[in-house]
Curated annotation (Swiss-Prot):
Component of the ubiquinol-cytochrome c reductase complex (complex III or cytochrome b-c1 complex) that is part of the mitochondrial respiratory chain. The b-c1 complex mediates electron transfer from ubiquinol to cytochrome c. Contributes to the generation of a proton gradient across the mitochondrial membrane that is then used for ATP synthesis. It comes from the Eukaryota. GO terms for cellular component: mitochondrial inner membrane. The gene is mt-cyb. This is Cytochrome b. It is a multi-pass membrane protein. Its main location: mitochondrion.
């Protein structure tokens, strides 16, 4: 969905809001693509948080190197 949204989105501060409105109003099923993208991203981060919770529950934080790599990957994912 990100590729379809990127074809119509502009990141310029003056036109960003109007490009989102264009996606929702003028692109065929643009509202659906936008909602699927938002819900998919939310579900992705919920899965990441569940994975972190599982690691905390099973004590994986004791493996310092593995845990630090995971934290770095989480921060890179959020950028």
């Amino acid at each position: 969905t990100a590729m379809f949204l990127a074809m119509h989105y502009t990141s310029d501060i003056a036109t960003a809001f109007s490009s989102v409105a264009h996606i929702c109003r003028d692109v065929n099923y643009g509202w659906l693509i936008r909602n699927m993208h938002a819900n998919g991203a939310s579900f992705f981060f919920i899965c990441i948080y569940l994975h972190i919770g599982r690691g905390l529950y099973y004590g994986s934080y004791l493996y310092k190197e593995t845990w630090n790599v995971g934290v770095i990957l989480l921060l890179l994912t959020m950028m």
